[in-house]
Each structure stands twice: as C-alpha cells, then as structure tokens.
Amino acid sequence: MSKVIGIDLGTTNSCVAVYENGEAKIIPNKEGKNTTPSIVAYTDKGEVLVGDPAKRQAITNPEKTIYSIKRIMGLMMNEPNAKEAQSKVGYKIVDRNGAAAVEIAGKVYTPQEISAKILGKLKADAEEYLGDKVTDAVITVPAYFNDAQRKATQEAGTIAGLNVLRIINEPTAASLAYGLDKKGEEKVLVYDLGGGTFDVTVLEIGDGTFEVLSTDGNAFLGGDDFDNAIIDWLAKEFKDENGFDIKNDKMALQRLKDAAENAKKELSSAESTEINLPFISMGNAGPIHLVKSLTRAKFESMTEKLIDETLDHIKIALKEAGLSKGDIDEIIMVGGSTRLPKANQVVKEFFGKDLNKGVNPDEVVAAGAAVQAGVLRGDVKDVLLLDVTPLSLGIETLGGVMTKLIDKGTTIPVKKSQVFSTADDNQPAVSIHVCQGEREFAKDNKSLGMFELSDIPAAPRGVPQIEVTFDIDANGVLNVSAKDKGTGKENKITISGSSGLSDAEIEKMVAEAEANKEADAKKKAVIEVRNQADALLHSTRKTLEENENAISEDEKKAIIDAAADLEETLKDENATKEQIEEKLKTLTDKSHKLAEAMYKKEQGEQAGAQPNQKAKKDDDDVIDAEVE
C-alpha cells in the first residue's frame, strides 16, 4: 500500500509530512526547506511558479502573483470579506458565478485551481522524497471552516491529483502530533494563530483518545492582519507627507507587504526596526523614498485589538467546554504568528502558567495530519479522534422558529432524526428549510438550503409523519433527507459548496445570539402561544361542527364567541403573549362542557384542545413544519 501524506495547506506557508517508522516526518521541498510559501505566480513567458520562486519575483509581478488564496476559498462575492480581501492584495478578485475567483491576464482561476498548484508541488516533493507515487492524502483546514470552504479544499486536492481521505481541523491535528505518546489524561488547549486564520480548541487527551470538547475562532484573523496593520500605518504616513495613496500602486503595495512582513518578524526579537523603501514612488520633485522606524511597542499598540480578540475566543471555548482556565493542563501554541511576543505574553498571563513550546509551530499541524494518515492506513493503532461541529444545525418550523436537530459542539460523524408533521389539513407537500446558527429564528441564522417533499397523501394536519434526518460525515459535510413514513417517499439534499457559512457570518451569529438571547426568548414564547392558540381554534371548531347537538345553544354560542375573540387577537401582530394567553384560557374554559360531552359520548376519549408539541430529541415527537 502506497504512503498517505499529511498536508497543512496554510494561508502563508504549507507543509507536508508522512508517518513512517513509528513517527511523523516532515518532508523537505526541492529547495531544502520544511515549509513552502503558499504563493503561485504566472509569468509573461507562460511559466507557473510555486513557492519560493513565486515569492522572489512578487514585487516585479504583483498582479500575477497570488498569495493568501486560502482567504477566498469558498467565499461568495456578496460576503463582506470578499470586498476586504480585494483591498489587501495586488491581484484582481472577480465574480465567477457568485463565487470569488482571481483573474490573471484575462483568464479566471478559481481558488481551488490556485490551491491545487500548491498541493501539486507538495505532492511532487513528497514523491521525490519517498521515491514512490503518492495519491492519498489527509488535508487540514481551520476548525471554523464552513461547508463551502471544506468542499473547496477537497476539490483542490482532487484537481491536484490527490484522493483526499479525510479533512481534519488544524488544532485537532496539532493535538494528535503533541499527544500521540502521552499516557495520562490531560485537558489541552490549542491556540492556533496562523497566517490567515485563528482557532482555539479544547481537547481531552488520554489512552489514545483525542476528544474535542469545544472549538471557536475566526478564519479571517491571522498574520496577514498584523502585516496589514503595518501596511495601513505606512500608507497613512506616506499619504500625510505626500498627499496620495501609495496603495493604489500595485507594485508599491507588494513592496509594502514584503516590508511589513519582514518588520513583523524582526520585532519578534528586536525592540525596533527600520523600514527602508527607496524609490517607492515618483512625485513632482522626483523619486520618493519611504523610511520609517517602528518600535515593538508601537506595533503592539496597533495590533492590540487582534490579540484581544484571540482571548475572547479562548473564553468562549472554555465556557462551551464547561471548564475554567485552571482546568487546562497544557497550552499548545501553534502557527507561525505565535512567535509574536505579545501573543505569548497575553496567553501566559491569562492562564497564569507557562506555555508549551515543545512543538514546532510551523510543522506540527502537518505532522498531525500525517498521524491521522497513519491511522487511516493502519500504521497507527488504538487512536480515536472525536471532533465536533462548530454551529447548531436545524430546520425552520411553524412561526419561523429554528428547531435544532444537531447542537453546536456535537461530536462528528453524527446522524440524528426527528419526526415533524403538516401545519394544514390536506397539505400536499412540505418545504424543508435547513439553517445553521445559534439564534432562535430561522431568518436570523444562515440558510444552507431548501428542498421539498411532495405528494403527501391528503390527511388532517398533524397526521402525516415526516422524518427529517441530518447526517454529518467525518469531513463535516452535511446531508439532509426527509421521508414520509406513511408512503416511504424520500427526498435528499447535500449541504456543500457555495451554500456554506462564511466565518465572519458565524462569528456575527454567535455574538448576536448572545446579545439577543432575551429578546429571542420573548419572541419565541409569543410564537409558541400563537401556535397553541391556532391549534386550539382548529380543533375546537372541528369538534363543535361534528358534535353541535351535544351541548346547549348558550354553551355553543359562548364557544363561538370565545373563538372569534381569540381569532381577532391573533390578527393583531403586536399582541403580547399575555393577551393571547388570556383569550386562550377563555376559549379553553368555555370548551369544557363540550369536552365533557365528548368524554361521555366516546367513553373517555378527550376531544378538547391539543397544543402543538415542541420538538424533542425523541424520533417519535411530532411538531409543525414550516410551509413555503
């Protein structure tokens, strides 16, 4: 059986490893380095350069040199991050069927195609090192990558000629490399600050089991943002002195980017650095030079909010894991940007303990991917990896409520089912609207997709049994099916590709969910009592119509009047929960005589009002489904 390689496809740099002779080994590239710049360039001669050769010519070829492509993987052009991404790069980002792509010399390339060039080089380097053909790989992604981004990564692997056996999260991969030989039980926090993404994951490691307890992060927070802070500062200083924006010059922007990256690296060990860019532009009086001194203190002041945000994600991850900072045994720093002194200082002060520096931050993720490859190949025994889904998943039900089937933090792979029903009599079809997020209402969450189950036999509301099943595989790809249990008819949808969430949207939803928790709860309570009232009206009128002679005319009139009163209240969109409940109670009270008559007539079968049932984890529960 051929070797299976592990690949860390990074925003700034990528790395490849293999598991052999009982350990993960980093494979050097043809240039003799353990990491390869995630840069692709197209030259005027028609050559395609990847890695260091592409990086070396970037300043003289800015519009045809593609870097940080990972930031637009699976990104839709109508998402805020697309516009921001264009303002930070020298190449052109364009709309390709709604998705972000790049245009080079009039030709459009997808992020998958560009990423495939990087993966192709890593594959070739691995084949040269191993002396054998490589086809299978495990590729890592940020823990907060959405469905579209994960799918795009898989497609990039396919384009590169790789069979992607598994997509795993970067912090989880790092924990595999760290904890493979650990014997005791530990609670570990992985702080992964890379070139373009940030993830924090809390795991419990012990006896070969790696269980993710929680994860949080931002796929648009990383080393690029620290570079951009310096670039923006330099551009502002230049504009203040010269009166125009130097960033409009693509070649000058590339020089600023290189200078900012170098300054950031120098400030990791020095207290100050000089940025010297001669002939950066031309003015009326001749050439303009840009020379600035930047201190570490100034740099840390400019990027303080970025570091503080990483702490916010740590706090969320700890809360969701049900742990305090004192419960964490080890803090593992992963990603090249963890070389920033301020990042180390802030995390160390927060936990009040030393950080684990025993892993190489640039290589540990690829090493972990190689370990997972070894597990899949059978070379690594007795290792169980339990990862989680980052956000709740569910469907829209009556009143616009999002009914969750899979909660945030659920271990994957996972398959869960729940039975729903129709909201109207003789309803011929139901629309299944799949949503992702933490808010109480579907409209406040991300719509992942919609499909219809039709040809439902005519039946009273609440009778059809529609079983909805959510199935998430080990790669995080979601499949949803709906089945009429009465007829066996089924319809399915795979949630992948461009329908996924952007990470900025995920962050926003989580924050909004917390901020609007109380308001959402009140709105949900009104929806629920409205549903209850609607169901009572329906059942009471139907029962009264079928048994109008069972009670007196006065009792019948009292029920009709109470029903009309409740119906009038429901027409008022601003009616409060208490107002509806008052009218609901009146109708219930007036219907007691009818219920008693039915009880006597049918020997104990209650025919009174039945409130809508709430969704539960039990598959046999039935609740109203939203109808489009």
Swiss-Prot record:
One of its GO terms (molecular function) is ATP-dependent protein folding chaperone. CDD domains: ASKHA_NBD_HSP70_DnaK-like (cd10234). Keywords: ATP-binding, Chaperone, Nucleotide-binding, Phosphoprotein, Stress response. The modification Phosphothreonine is found at T197. Induction: By stress conditions e.g. heat shock. Belongs to the heat shock protein 70 family. Acts as a chaperone. This is Chaperone protein DnaK. It comes from Aliarcobacter butzleri (strain RM4018) (Arcobacter butzleri).
